[in-house]
């Protein structure tokens, strides 16, 4: 098997490397952006890669009629809802980019199906199980958890799923070592099962907005403090986000992150 590398520059000047594998005279490419492997000689492979690439990089198309706009009850504000929205309550923000945050309605099959497609993407990137959606997708799951998405220019570019926690699952995690603190049982309210932002929109504060939206809307009538929000086995990037969002410095000098099993 031979391995060749095709080098090019991206629009931001970074050098990209596209790997080319020759297996039994069949060329297999690895996309330097979405990291999918495919055969450029296969029509099906090329089509599959095009769809996969667009979803991972730019997000998923989203109907303007899907989801319930999320309100900040402390300021009577609809979070990131465009001025053209039929929902006129409160003050809108981020109108110029046509951005909004909505909650998935578990009794709407089209919304649930679309969200499950997004979760496929999320779980592929995180190498996480694909069967952890029942707490937000079942019609009787009102008080078990919620799924929330961030929409920009009619595409879902970010998503979060949160679940109501049972106290025996709550722990503190030492950020530097990724180990749990023994014999301490803190009390947290919401667990972040998944959080994701498409690659083209990372570093723009979308993850933090999703976290805030989840805190104020996941439990009806309750605005959850950010220190009551726990993380589930965060990835490297997730750990950095957790440290920034609600990590606390212990007297030992270590950073502690609220997490759950």
From Swiss-Prot:
GO BP annotations, alphabetical order: chromatin looping; DNA replication; double-strand break repair; establishment of meiotic sister chromatid cohesion; establishment of mitotic sister chromatid cohesion; mitotic chromosome condensation; regulation of mitotic nuclear division; telomere organization
InterPro entries in the record: AcTrfase_ESCO_Znf_dom (IPR028005), Acyl_CoA_acyltransferase (IPR016181), ESCO_Acetyltransf_dom (IPR028009), GNAT_dom (IPR000182)
GO terms, molecular function: chromatin binding; protein-lysine-acetyltransferase activity; zinc ion binding
UniProtKB keywords: Acyltransferase, Cell cycle, Metal-binding, Nucleus, Transferase, Zinc, Zinc-finger
Localization: Nucleus
Top EC category: transferase
GO CC field: chromatin; nuclear replication fork
Residue intervals passing through the bilayer: none
Function: Probable acetyltransferase required for the establishment of sister chromatid cohesion and couple the processes of cohesion and DNA replication to ensure that only sister chromatids become paired together. In contrast to the structural cohesins, the deposition and establishment factors are required only during S phase. Acts by acetylating the cohesin complex component SMC3.
Protein name (Swiss-Prot/TrEMBL): N-acetyltransferase ECO1
Protein species of origin: Candida glabrata (strain ATCC 2001 / BCRC 20586 / JCM 3761 / NBRC 0622 / NRRL Y-65 / CBS 138) (Yeast)
Gene: ECO1
